[in-house]
UniProtKB/Swiss-Prot annotation:
The keyword Cytoplasm applies. During stationary phase, converts 70S ribosomes to an inactive dimeric form (100S ribosomes). It comes from Tolumonas auensis (strain DSM 9187 / NBRC 110442 / TA 4). This is Ribosome modulation factor. GO terms for cellular component: cytoplasm.
């Protein structure tokens, strides 16, 4: 069960990262669960930071 939960949270982080790279607002987070929402926002923050520092090249 713990592995499944971790995988779900990692997927939330990945989806948040992708949303951040695409320039979407953090208000569009699809998760209601606090844990998943936190992971999604963490991924989103990482992507936004990388975009602002110029790491991502389209």
């Amino acid at each position: 069960m713990k592995r499944q939960k971790r995988d779900r949270l990692e997927r939330a982080r990945t989806k948040g990262y992708q949303a951040g790279l695409a320039g979407r607002s953090k208000e569009l987070c699809p998760y209601q669960c606090i844990d998943a929402r936190g992971y999604w926002l963490g991924g989103w923050r990482d992507a936004v930071d990388e975009r602002s520092q110029g790491y991502m090249v389209n």
